Amino acid sequence: MVARVLMYSTRLCPYCRMAERLLDKKGVQAEKVMVDENPARRDEMVRLTGRTSVPQIFIGDEHVGGYRELAGLERTGRLDELLQL
């Protein structure tokens, strides 16, 4: 079973779209939390990650960071392991 992916995002974020495309190539759909539409969820993201930028991505219970970190996991081959593919 594929790991749950949660992505804090905004509608106009290009890095969010890039992360979504990378996950789509893997056949994985992220559950998106739109922080531009819900300030309480933005506060939650900052509390959980210590970061204010988007995307912020969780795979299972692990905070992996943003798009650059996600792409780095793909380059090293670790993304499939985390996604349980």
Give each language-model segment a name.
Residues 31, 53-54, 81:
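A local structural micro-motif
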Residues 28-41:
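Thiol-based oxidoreductase modules, predominantly thioredoxin-like and allied folds used
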Residues 15, 44, 56, 66-69:
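Residue-level recognition of specific faces of alpha-helices
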Residues 47-53:
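Thiol/disulfide oxidoreductase modules built on the thioredoxin-like
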Residues 1-29:
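Local sequence-structure signature of Cys/Sec-based thiol-disulfide redox active-site neighborhoods
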Residues 59-85:
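Non-catalytic, surface beta->alpha helical segment in thiol-disulfide oxidoreductase systems
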Residues 1, 42-46:
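Short secondary-structure transition/capping segments
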